Amino acid sequence: MATQVMGQSSGGGSLFNNSGNMGMALPNDMYDLHDLSKAELAAPQLIMLANVALTGEVNGSCCDYLVGEERQMAELMPVGDNHFSDSEGEGLEESAELKGDPSGLDNMELRSLELSVVEPQPVFEASAAPEVYSSNKDPAPEAPVAEDKCKNLKAKPFRCKPCQYEAESEEQFVHHIRVHSAKKFFVEESAEKQAKARESGASPSEEGEFSKGPIRCDRCGYNTNRYDHYTAHLKHHLRAGDNERVYKCIICTYTTVSEYHWRKHLRNHFPRKVYTCSKCNYFSTEKNNYVQHVRTHTGERPYKCELCPYSSSQKTHLTRHMRTHSGEKPFKCDQCNYVASNQHEVTRHARQVHNGPKPLNCPHCDYKTADRSNFKKHVELHVNPRQFNCPVCDYAASKKCNLQYHFKSKHPTCPSKTMDVSKVKLKKTKRREADLHRDAAAAATEQTDTEQAKTKGVDASARRSERPVKGVGKDVPKEKKPCSNASVVQVTTRTRKSAVETKAAEGKHTDGQTGNNAEKSSKAKKSKRKMDAEAHPSVEPVTEGPVTKKKKTESKPKTSGEVPKGSRVEDRKADKQQSASIKKGGKKTALKTKTAKKGSKLAPKWVGHTEPSSEMAQGGESPVPALTQAVVTPSGSTQTELSSPMDIAQTEPAQMDVSQTGPPQVQRPLPVEPAQLEPSPPQEPPQVEPPACVEPPPPVEPPCPMEPAEMEPSPPMEPSQVEPPPHLEPPLPMELPQVELPPVEDCQKELPPVEHAQTKVAQTGPTQVGAVQEEPLFCLRATSSQANQKVISPKDRAKEKLSVLSEMARQEQVLIEVGLVPVRDSQLLKASKSAPDLPAPPSPLPKGHLRREETPKDQEMFSDGEGNKVSPLEKGGTEEAGESRAELAAPMESTSALSSEQSSNAPDGETLHSECQADSTAVCEMEVDTEQKTDRVPLKDSAVEPVSPLNPRVDPEAAAPAVVASPPITLAESQEIDEDEGIHSHDGSDLSDNMSEGSDDSGLHGARPAPQEATSKSGKEGLAVKVTEGEFVCIFCDRSFRKEKDYSKHLNRHLVNVYFLEEAAEEQE
C-alpha cells in the first residue's frame, strides 16, 4: 500500500526533490517494521523517530483520503476497503508488482528505511525529544501541508531525530540510516524477503509483537489492553458500515476508522512541532495541551465559574462543571436510560451495572471492579484483614452479623463466653490478642453479672424493697438480662433460661410499648432492637392489645380476687373458645406434640433441677416452706396456710401472677411494684381462693405436669376472664402452650373451685400471661405493670380486674382472630420464668402428656401442683381434670408440700404480691439458690424428668409456677425465636427462622403465612426442649448449662448479638 501511494505521488519520480537518485537505496536496503524485532520497535509514544523529509507532494490518487495530506500521511499508509486485508497481503503484492518501477521501488525502499529507522528507537526518551525539538523548531513544521513541507524540506537538510543527525543530502541521510539501523535494528537485505515476510503473516506476527494487550479486533487487527478502548473502537466499525475504511499506522499497531484520529495519530510519529516544558520532561505536539500543562506549574486557572468560586485551568473542565448548575446531562447510557453530566460517569455506570470492563483489579486476589471506593474497601480487607475473628477457628468476618452466623453454623456447642459477638472488638492487626481480651472481658462480665444478680437478689429478698429488685433488674439486664429476670422471679429460678428469653422478648415488646426503657436503659437498648425485629410480626395486633392488656392485667391482679367468678368464667369461656379455635388450627397440636416430647425429655433435667434446687419440690413441704419464706420475706404477709392442693393451686396462680408480674418487673425492674402487687394479690388470692376451693385443686395438678404450665398460663387468662367455665378453657390451648395441655385443662376444669381462686390469681397472672403470650413481651411488661397497679390500689384492682378480665378475654379473642397467640402464653412464659418448676411446655398438650408419661410422679406432683394452679384456668376439660386429679393423687402428696407452700404463698393476695416481691427479692435469693441447686440438679433433672425442663425447681411453689412458667418459657423461646427470625431469618438462619416462626407469640403469624405456625410449633418445641433438657439449653446454639447463672450469661450474649443483628437487619430494610 505504501509503495502504491508513494509510486503514485505526483511530485515526480522521487519523493525527495533534493536528490535525483531514486535508486540509491537498493531493494536489499529496504527496512520494514516486519523485519524489526519487537524489542527494536520504538514505542508509539516516542513520536520523534525521524523527520524523514519527503520532498514530493502527495497528490496521489491511490487513496482519496490521502489527497492533500502531508508527506507523513503518505508514509503511514491508510488501508481502505479496497486495500485492506487481514494479512496485508494485497498491499504487499501491489508493492511487489511495483518493484519493476524503479521510482516506485526506490520510493518504497526509502520510505521503508526512513520508517524503520524512525520506529525502532526504543532508546529514544522523552527528555531527548524536547532538546531536539527545541533546537529544531523551525524545521519541525513539515506536517501542515504537503506543499509547505516540500518547501521547508527543500531548504533544510535531512535530520535523524533519534540521534539528532542532520544530512544535507538524501544520500548521506540514507547512509546514516543504514549505519544507525545496523546498530539498532535488524536490517532486511532483500526487499523480496521483506515482502514475503509481510505476505506470510508478518502482519499477524508483528501485530502480535506490537500488540499492546491481549484484546485484538478481528476486523482490523486493532490491539489494546483496555477493554473500554476496544469497545469504543468497535463503534467505529459499526458506524462505518459497508463503506468502512480502516486507517492503519505502518509504524505502530494503531488502527482506526476515523480519518481525523488517524491524522492526529500520525503527528505523534512525525510532529511538525513539539512543545517542551522547561520545568519538566513534558512535551506535546498540541499547543493547547502544552499550555494547559504549563498552568499546572504556574497555578493559573483562567476559567472561572460565574455562579460559584470554581475555577479551572482548562475550559473543558469549566464546561463540565457548569452542567452541575444547569442540570444538563447530555451523556446517556447505551443500554439503559441512565444519563449523566460527564462521560466518565456513564462509563462507570456501564461497568458497574452492565458488567462492563472493570479496570480496577485487586493485587491480592481476582477481585475486579469499576468503582474506586469499593476497590479501596476491598483492598483494605487484604491490608487490614477482617476485624471480627472467630476465637475458635481461623475464620474472620468483616461484620459482626457474619461472625454471629458463623458461630451458629460452625460452633453451635461452644461456650457462650467464647462466642459472644458483643465482646468482639475491631482487630486491626492482632486477632488472637483481641480474642483473648474479648474472652477475658466476657468472663469477667459474666462473673460480675452473676455476682451482682445474686447479691441483688439476696438484698431484694432481705429488704423486700422493690427498688433493690429494680436495681437487680436494671443491672442484671444490662449485664445479663436472663440473670435479672431469673432474680426477679422466684419460680423462674430453674426457668431462668425461659425467663431470660422471655425477658429478652418482653424487653423488646415492653420497652417499645410500656416505656420501660427509662427504667432499664440497657434493656431498653436490647429490647428495642428485639422489638424492632419482633415488633414487625407482633406489634400490629400485639402492640395495641398488649398495652391495653397491661393495664387490664394490672387491674386484673387488683380485682382478680374481687372479680366474680361469673365474669372470670365468661372470660375463660371466651379464652377457651379462642384457644379452641386455635387448637383446631392444629398448630398448637403439632407444637404440643413436639414440645411435649422435648419437654418430656428436658423435664427430667429441670425436675432434677427443681428437686435439688429447692429440694422442697421433692420434700413437698420443705419446698413450700422455702417458697413461703421467700414470699414472706418480700411481702412479710406471706401465708403458709395454703397447704391444700387448692391452696397450692391458688398459691401457684398467685405465683404465676408474681412470676408474670415478676418477669415484667424484671424487664421493668419494678421490685417495688411487685411488693405492692403482693399486698393486692393477697386480696385477690383470698377472693380467688373461695372459687379455688369450690373447684377441686387436685385435678388441677394432674393435668400435664409440664404442659399444665403451658395450659395453665392460658387458662389463667381465660379463668380470669371466665372462671366459671374452666371446663370451657380447653379452647385456651389457643395459645400454643395451652394446646399442649388439653389434659391439664381438663384437670383444671375439674378443679374449677380450687382453681377459680387460682384462676383469679392466674387471671391476674396467667390471664396476664395469656395476654403476654398474645402480645408476648408487651403483655409481660403489662403484667408487671398490672401487678404494680394491683399493689397501688386493691379496691381499684377489684374493679379493674372485672373490666380487665373481660377486656383481656376480648383482646385475646381479637388477637386469636388476628392469628396471634393470646397474651396468656407470654404471661405463662413469665410465670415459667417465675416458676422454674414449670416444665418447659413450650409446646402444648403433647409436651404435657409426654412430661406426664416421662416425668416421675414427683415431677407429676410438681407439675400437678402447677396444674392445680393453672389447670383450672387453662381448661375446664373434665377428662384432663380427671387425669390431673388422678395424677394429683400421687402428686398431691408431693404437692401437699407444694400446696403448703402455695397456701402460704397464695392464701393472701399479699402472698402473691409478696411473691412478686419475693420474685424481686426472695426470688433473687431463690434464683441464686436455684442456680446453685440447678447446678447440682441439672443432671438429676435430665435424668428425672426430661419432659419438664422448666421443673428444675420442683418446689410446690415452683410446681405451680412451673405450669404457668412453661408457657412463658414457650413465649420466651418463641420470642427469642422471633428475635432470631427477625435477625436470622433475615440473614437466613434456619434454626432461628424455624424457631421464630414456630412461636405463637412471635407475632409472625400475622406477618408470615400459616407455615410459620408449623415452624413456630417446631421452634417452640425446639426451644422448650433446649430449655428443658435436664439443663438450661440455649435456643440459639443448643448448648446446655447446668447452672442458670451460666445459662443466663450465655443467653445474654446471644441476646446482645441478636440486638446487633436486628439493628443490621433493620438498617438494611
From Swiss-Prot:
Residues 144-417 are annotated as: Interaction with ZFP90. Residues 981-1059 are annotated as: Interaction with RCOR1. Residues 43-57 are annotated as: Interaction with SIN3B. One of its GO terms (molecular function) is RNA polymerase II core promoter sequence-specific DNA binding. Residues 32-121 are annotated as: Interaction with SIN3A. Residues 484-493, 630-643 have a biased composition (Polar residues). Residues 584-600 have a biased composition (Basic residues). Expressed in the hippocampus including the granule cell layer of the dentate gyrus, the pyramidal cell layers of CA1 and CA3, the apical and basilar dendrite layers of the stratum radiatum and stratum oriens of CA1, the stratum lucidum and stratum oriens of CA3 and in astroglia (at protein level). Expressed in the brain, with the highest levels in the neurons of hippocampus, pons/medulla and midbrain. Residues 451-482, 498-511, 554-576, 851-860, 876-886, 930-943 have a biased composition (Basic and acidic residues). InterPro entries: Zinc_finger/UBP_domain (IPR050688), Znf_C2H2_sf (IPR036236), Znf_C2H2_type (IPR013087). The modification Phosphoserine is found at residue 948. GO terms for cellular component: chromatin; cytoplasm; cytosol; nucleus; protein-containing complex; transcription repressor complex. Gene3D superfamilies: Classic Zinc Finger (3.30.160.60). Residues 894-904, 957-968 have a biased composition (Low complexity). Residues 679-706, 713-734 have a biased composition (Pro residues). The keyword Iron-sulfur does not apply. A zinc finger (C2H2-type) spans 158-180, 215-237, 247-269, 275-297, 303-325, 331-354, 360-382, 388-411, 1032-1054. It is found in: Nucleus; Cytoplasm. Keywords: Cytoplasm, Metal-binding, Nucleus, Phosphoprotein, Repeat, Repressor, Transcription, Transcription regulation, Ubl conjugation, Zinc, Zinc-finger. Its main location: nucleus. One of its GO terms (biological process) is auditory receptor cell stereocilium organization. It comes from the Eukaryota. Residues 85-104, 425-737, 830-1022 are annotated as: Disordered. Transcriptional repressor which binds neuron-restrictive silencer element (NRSE) and represses neuronal gene transcription in non-neuronal cells. Restricts the expression of neuronal genes by associating with two distinct corepressors, SIN3A and RCOR1, which in turn recruit histone deacetylase to the promoters of REST-regulated genes. Mediates repression by recruiting the BHC complex at RE1/NRSE sites which acts by deacetylating and demethylating specific sites on histones, thereby acting as a chromatin modifier. Isoform 1 and isoform 6 form heterodimers. Isoform 6: Forms homodimers and homooligomers; binds to the neuron-restrictive silencer element (NRSE) as monomer. Interacts with SIN3A, SIN3B and RCOR1. Interacts with CDYL. Interacts with EHMT1 and EHMT2 only in the presence of CDYL. Part of a complex containing at least CDYL, REST, WIZ, SETB1, EHMT1 and EHMT2. Interacts (via zinc-finger DNA-binding domain) with ZFP90 (via N- and C-termini); the interaction inhibits REST repressor activity. Interacts (via C2H2-type zinc finger 5) with PRICKLE1. Interacts with FBXW11 and BTRC. Interacts with USP7. This is RE1-silencing transcription factor. It comes from Rattus norvegicus (Rat). The gene is Rest.
